[in-house]
Swiss-Prot record:
GO terms for cellular component: cytoplasm; cytosolic large ribosomal subunit; nucleolus. GO terms for biological process: translation. Belongs to the eukaryotic ribosomal protein eL18 family. It is found in: Cytoplasm. GO terms for molecular function: RNA binding; structural constituent of ribosome. Keywords: Cytoplasm, Ribonucleoprotein, Ribosomal protein. This is Large ribosomal subunit protein eL18. Residues 179-198 have a biased composition (Basic residues). Its main location: cytoplasm. Residues 157-198 are annotated as: Disordered.
Length: 198
């Protein structure tokens, strides 16, 4: 008799070799960066190609404040400097209204929100697309690859068992009023019997 091999299917890693996106712009970028990854020896193009293939939930957005904090550590910015390093985000860049002043930054992303684009341009920065980046830095020189937190989604808060001690996962049913009110709990003056139709 053979032995049942349980859990074998869980061990296999799912690796994407193509995109499921119907966006023609992303499909063209995948072609471009696949070509650059083959023709150049830089690992930058390979990483960008792999991230372009990923699903939207794995291409998490990032806020301007996070980019500003990271880029401030990396380099000192001068207004409208073309030699400043480029922050590369394979995803969306969103505005942060809590940040009154942002430094002049050069940012390349798949998409910018309207207010994020206005903030970058107003600060003397530059918003780049990936085809422009391929012309400026075909090997990824003078660039910093950044990405947003994947755990920032609201649905991630529900992952795990919410009733287990020490677990901070959010329950799906937050309003438990009728189940735990007076007359239902033991030791609260009386216990109401369940109503039955005869």
């Amino acid at each position: 008799m053979g032995v049942d091999l349980t859990g074998i299917s869980k061990k296999s890693r799912v690796i994407r070799h193509h995109t499921y996106s119907t966006n023609p712009y992303i499909k063209l970028l995948i072609k471009l960066y696949k070509f650059l990854a083959k023709r150049t020896s830089s690992g930058f193009n390979k990483v960008v190609y792999q991230r372009l293939i990923k699903s939207r939930s794995n291409r998490a957005p990032i806020s301007l404040s996070r980019i500003a904090v990271v880029m401030k550590r990396k380099a000192v910015f001068t207004a409208k400097s073309k030699a400043a390093p480029i922050a590369v985000v394979v995803g969306d860049v969103l505005d942060d209204v809590r940040m009154a002043r942002i430094p002049a930054m050069r940012v390349c992303a798949l998409r910018f929100s309207k207010s994020a684009r206005q903030s970058i341009v107003a600060a003397g920065g530059e918003c780049l697309t990936f085809d422009q980046l391929a012309m400026i830095a075909p090997t990824g020189k003078n660039t910093y690859l950044l990405r947003g937190r994947k755990s920032g989604r609201e649905s991630v808060r529900h992952f795990g068992a919410s009733g287990v001690p020490g677990s901070h996962s959010k329950p799906y049913a937050t309003n438990r009023g009728k189940e735990t009110k007076r007359g239902r709990r033991t030791g609260r003056s009386y216990k109401r019997k369940a109503f039955r139709h005869v």
